Design a protein with these regions (language model features):
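N-terminal activation segment of mature serine protease catalytic domains
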Residues: 1-35, 42, 79, 87-90, ...
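Terminal peptide-recognition signature
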Residues: 16, 34, 40, 44, ...
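Short, small/polar residue-rich loop motifs at catalytic or cofactor-binding pockets
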Residues: 28-31, 170-174
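Catalytic-histidine neighborhood of serine endopeptidases
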Residues: 29-31, 37-85, 121
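C-terminal subregion of chymotrypsin/trypsin-like serine protease catalytic domains
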Residues: 37, 179-234
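Short peripheral tails and domain-boundary helices/loops at the edges of structured domains
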Residues: 68-70, 137-156, 211-213, 218-230
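Short, structured beta-strand/loop micro-motifs enriched in basic residues and often containing a Trp
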Residues: 94-101
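Flexible, gly/ser-rich surface segments that form the specificity/activation loops bordering the active-site cleft
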Residues: 101-163, 168-173, 189-201
């Protein structure tokens, strides 16, 4: 079902490496996926642009991106335009991108039961060595179904909305776009919920099987609104 959408969408999907110096002579890094939504403009998860992926810490000061078809080439430098910790969205800009291929964002909700897919760089790893930083990426597809479009109220009374899908994503999937069979994007993955049946999370076996495993997605409508607020019309 997604064999047609994946080759097209991968043209606009990137691995992101964010770094900052730490005393005395070290470097700290975060990583995630990102996708281009307008020429040179990319969306990723806000927590991925913060040190230790912690929204309560400072943002990194260096951002580099590599497009899926360009793996093995030199990474492209980007600047952070804006971020919204509540929505968990961030905008990055590449001044002179190698490619301007973009993904199309849906501007209406997708009904529950719709098959969906995701493409990006979960399970990526960063290594530090004398010659520099190694960023190890494998492009991965994941499939699921949309289980709910949730409208809720946060602890301070603000309305929030997000999608739920019915399968757990690989670790490190933040920033991956979620799309339907046409390739159009319904959201961006930013978190998952896992709940087991056992009392002791260290125990395994029938008494501690996972009984809840869902993934949550920032909606495409929120992405469009966030981009518009920051001068990017999608």
């Amino acid at each position: 079902m997604f064999a047609t959408a994946c080759p097209s969408n991968r043209e606009a999907i990137y691995g992101m490496l964010a770094t900052s110096p730490v005393k005395p002579q070290g470097v700290t890094a975060s990583n995630g996926s990102a996708f281009m939504v307008a020429p040179g403009i990319l969306i990723t998860a806000a927590h991925c642009v913060h040190i230790e992926t912690n929204p309560n810490k400072s943002v990194h000061n260096k951002f580099e991106l590599i497009r899926a078809p360009d793996i093995g080439q030199k990474m492209e430098s980007a600047t952070l335009i804006a971020f919204d910790k509540k929505k968990d969205l961030a905008l990055l800009k590449i001044d002179e991108p190698r490619s301007t291929a973009c993904l199309k964002l849906l501007k209406a909700t997708v009904p529950p039961g719709t098959p969906c897919g995701s493409l990006g760089f979960p399970l990526a790893s960063v290594s530090f060595n004398p010659s520099g930083i190694g960023f190890n990426l494998i492009e991965r597809f994941q499939g699921a179904n949309i289980s709910a479009f949730v409208v809720a109220t946060d602890p301070i009374g603000n309305k929030i909305s997000f999608y739920e899908t019915d399968s757990l994503m690989y670790g490190g999937s933040s920033g991956c776009p979620g799309f339907i069979a046409s390739g159009e994007v319904f959201g961006m993955n930013n978190r998952s919920a896992i709940e087991g049946t056992g009392d002791n999370p260290k125990e395994s076996g029938a008494g501690n099987r996972t009984r809840l495993a869902i993934s949550m997605w920032v909606t495409s409508m929120d992405i469009v609104a966030f981009a518009s607020t920051n001068g990017v019309v999608l």
